[in-house]
Swiss-Prot record:
Post-translational modification: Phosphorylated by FAM20C in the extracellular medium.
One GO MF term attached to the UniProt entry: serine-type endopeptidase inhibitor activity
Record-annotated membrane-spanning stretches: none
Principal place of residence: secreted
Subunit: I-alpha-I plasma protease inhibitors are assembled from one or two heavy chains (HC) and one light chain, bikunin. Inter-alpha-inhibitor (I-alpha-I) is composed of ITIH1/HC1, ITIH2/HC2 and bikunin.
Source organism per UniProt: Bos taurus
Name of this protein: Inter-alpha-trypsin inhibitor heavy chain H2
Amino acid sequence: LHYQEVKWRKLGSYEHRLHLKPGRLAKHELEVFNGYFVHFPAPENMIPIG
């Protein structure tokens, strides 16, 4: 699963959107800010969605 995550503030509240691309493999890392990455392991009990 490959995804993009967008969060922005509008009129005092935050909106959060995920753009998903099923079928694409993604590395176990997430770019947080200005090239900094957070690494995370995939859960072993993860079940694919239909």
